[in-house]
Amino acid sequence: MEIIEENQRGINIYKLNGHLDSNTSLGFENKLIQAIDDGSKSMIIDFKNLDYISSAGLRVILKATKALKREDGKIMLCDMQDYVKEVFEISGFDSLLPIVGSMGDALDAFSPNRGPYGK
């Protein structure tokens, strides 16, 4: 899996390409937890080019979400392909995690008084 990292407006953005599974989840988990440990409180994970996610991948997303919440941070998930979105729906994670349709919607959610998950 390829991970493209960006930072916009102080928000760490992770664009995933390929498969997030048992072979790739540990590296991604370490990257997210390290960013949180380094003080990041705002993250977006872009699933636009992610072709596959396993239960190991779901666990990484949930673990990062919980770690951010402990630090009063926020994570947004965006731009999921139908298959990936279906995995989140079947697992029930879609009701636990903030998922929006586009990167623009995810960025807007971090603006004061904007977006469905804005503070």
Residue ranges and their predicted role:
Residues 1, 95-107:
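A short, terminal or domain-edge coil/loop segment
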Residues 1-15:
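Short beta-strand/loop segment at the start of cytosolic alpha/beta domains
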Residues 4, 78, 100:
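General small-molecule cofactor/ligand-binding pocket signal
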Residues 8-9, 48, 104:
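Conserved catalytic submotifs in the C-terminal HATPase_c
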Residues 16-18, 102:
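Active-site donor-binding loop signature of nucleotide-sugar glycosyltransferases
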Residues 20-97:
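Amphipathic alpha-helical interaction surfaces in cytosolic regulatory modules
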Residues 102-119:
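A charged, well-structured terminal subsegment
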